[in-house]
């Protein structure tokens, strides 16, 4: 498998970044839901710290993914589909990128406005990006939670669209992003 994208499929780096971000976002949800059930104490604070660290990792990977997309150029040839579906696919991908960036940024803002640092697995702390402010913290907390609901919805629609292409249209859309899978040989 090649690192770079080609007309036949996505390269190893694009696939790795895609699936790493997917797995980390799912882990984020599981960690924070579990943390909310814990009483205040070291376990809860450790879970929240891990949630923040993974969020910043997602932000970094998303920035690398976008940079790779811009630098790499070549991407798989588009699958023939009606214009409205092409527009919906492009809009959906753009929205996913936006949400994947906005989610950790609003989390970082939420943490900063609460006066809490955002660390990275205990190795270092990111700078505060906003002054401590209770009202701003409440606002960013609501935005962060609302954005996750939108992200989850768009991600499910994205997955359903890929499954539709695979099982109904029987095209290469899903196969070209699956790890360790290449296009069908014809």
Residue ranges and their predicted role:
Residues 1-186:
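Membrane-embedded alpha-helical bundles that constitute the cytochrome b-like, heme-associated redox core
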């Amino acid at each position: 498998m090649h690192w770079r994208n080609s007309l036949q499929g996505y390269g190893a780096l694009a696939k790795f970044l895609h699936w790493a971000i997917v797995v980390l976002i799912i882990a984020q949800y599981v960690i924070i839901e579990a943390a909310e059930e814990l009483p205040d104490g070291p376990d809860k604070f450790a879970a929240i710290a891990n949630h923040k660290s993974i969020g910043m990792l997602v932000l970094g990977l998303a920035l690398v993914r976008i940079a790779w997309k811009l630098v790499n150029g070549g991407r798989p040839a588009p699958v023939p589909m009606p214009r409205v579906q092409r527009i919906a696919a492009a809009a959906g991908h753009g929205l996913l990128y936006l949400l994947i960036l906005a989610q950790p940024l609003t989390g970082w803002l939420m943490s900063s406005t609460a006066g809490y640092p955002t660390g990275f697995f205990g190795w270092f702390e990111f700078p505060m990006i906003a002054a401590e402010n209770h009202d701003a913290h409440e606002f960013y907390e609501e935005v962060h939670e609302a954005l996750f609901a939108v992200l989850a919805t768009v991600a499910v629609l994205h997955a359903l669209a890929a499954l539709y292409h695979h099982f109904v249209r029987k095209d290469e859309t899903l196969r070209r992003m699956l790890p360790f899978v290449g296009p069908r040989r014809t």
